[in-house]
Regions:
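Sec-dependent N-terminal signal peptides
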Residues: 5-13
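C-terminal segment of classical bacterial N-terminal signal peptides
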Residues: 14-21
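Bacterial extracytoplasmic/cell-wall-associated proteins, especially those involved in peptidoglycan
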Residues: 21-177
């Protein structure tokens, strides 16, 4: 709820002045950019909220690297939400993620995706990092990584990727062509 309220206020506050049609078009572009940054911030928060800022940046850069890789979707939200879906039992026209089958586990773990009230400061950091990554203000410290995992697991796919760097407790990999 807090996230949606902040997003709505930010969109209204940033609508440019000028002609009505230009304002609507610019507001639409701004809303898209803001939505993309919220998707990225959510992923950074849920995947790396217990990491240093460098670790959070690494996780965010993997999403950006995937957006820029033709093997993945071409928007931040599509990358974060990538995975199989199924029809909702309430409304078959509404598709929902298949539990535990998403690219990023938090997105389809069946738990609430609401930001924890006692971690708003961490979400603020994640949002700032997301904005800087989206704006191109952060150099890639992952050496082009498109994948990562926690250092306490060894997924089968790790053997097929090139390890690039370890930041905090995440190991990053690049998927070669």
């Amino acid at each position: 709820m807090i996230k949606q309220l902040v997003l709505g206020v930010a969109v209204l506050a940033m609508i440019p002045s000028g002609s009505k049609s230009a304002s609507i078009a610019e507001a639409g572009e701004f809303h898209t950019a803001l939505t993309e940054q919220v998707c990225l911030a959510n992923n950074i928060y849920w995947e790396a909220r217990n990491q240093t800022e460098e670790g959070m940046i690494g996780v965010g850069l993997v999403v950006r690297n995937r957006v820029n890789d033709n093997r993945f979707p071409h928007s931040y939200c599509e990358v974060v939400h990538q995975g199989p879906t199924r029809p909702s039992w309430k409304n078959p026209n509404n598709r929902i993620p298949v539990k535990h089958r998403c690219q990023f586990s938090w997105y389809c773990d069946g738990r609430s995706d609401d930001i924890r009230a006692n971690e708003l400061d961490i979400y603020t950091i994640a949002s700032d990092i997301a904005h800087r990554i989206y704006s191109g203000d952060i150099t890639d410290i992952t050496n082009g990584a498109t994948h990562y995992h926690a250092d306490y697991v060894i997924p089968a796919w790790a053997a097929t990727k090139i390890r690039t760097v370890k930041i905090d407790n995440h190991i990053f990999y690049r998927w070669e062509f």
